[in-house]
């Protein structure tokens, strides 16, 4: 069986066994508070993992958004998922950037929108699985002024963890927190999916506290 087949089979099998307690959560959710809502003090941009539905997914994105609002105030945070050309398909995981350029561009568009629509907002970001590669590559592509407005980033099941040496190249390491669960082989530069890769919902509160500390500092 090829590595690609293992990746697809692993996702299919483990998705059925994922510990998501609610059917609604399994279906994923979307948040477009930057695109459709008023400017808020903090904007959280998130890219979901492969095959997750909605633009926030269900494994960890909605949890970080909810916890961040609890920490900072629901009227202070706008949550925005990366959608559009980023359709979270499986195949782009096998490309050199662990995603495709169209998906990276979809994320950079969200950073650009936050900057132009809400110039005073503090930007934080996160990504899970393929979404971690989307955010990683997007932040590298930002110009220096916009990159400086990104106050903190959290990455879960970081597919480029080995390649990028546990950081986002060109972005401050102390503003980045990477979550790689014990037994998550994706963090070891493989695309083999284990149960550990679906465990990051448990880290949502901690990730939100990290991001909150960066915008409050």
From Swiss-Prot:
Disulphide bonds in the chain: 39-118, 65-79, 180-187
Q: Which GO terms describe its molecular function?
A: cutinase activity
Any one GO CC term of the record: extracellular region
Site residues, Transition state stabilizer: 50, 130
Q: Which residues form the active site?
A: 129 (nucleophile), 184, 197 (proton donor/acceptor)
**A Pfam family hit:** Cutinase
The UniProt entry, under Gene3D superfamilies, shows: alpha/beta hydrolase
Q: Which UniProt keywords apply?
A: Disulfide bond, Hydrolase, Secreted, Serine esterase, Signal
Could you give a single Gene Ontology term from the biological process aspect?
Answer: carbohydrate catabolic process
Indicate where this protein resides in the cell: Secreted
What catalytic reaction does the record list?
cutin + H2O = cutin monomers
Principal localization reads secreted
By its UniProt entry, which InterPro entries does this protein fall under?
AB_hydrolase_fold, Cutinase/axe, CUTINASE_1, Cutinase_monf
Which EC class, in a word? Answer: hydrolase
**Signal peptide region:** 1-17
> Which EC numbers characterise this protein's activity in its record?
3.1.1.74
Task performed by this protein: Catalyzes the hydrolysis of complex carboxylic polyesters found in the cell wall of plants. Degrades cutin, a macromolecule that forms the structure of the plant cuticle.
Similarity comment: family membership: Belongs to the cutinase family.
Q: What is the recorded name of this protein?
A: Probable cutinase 3
Species per Swiss-Prot/TrEMBL record? Neosartorya fischeri (strain ATCC 1020 / DSM 3700 / CBS 544.65 / FGSC A1164 / JCM 1740 / NRRL 181 / WB 181)
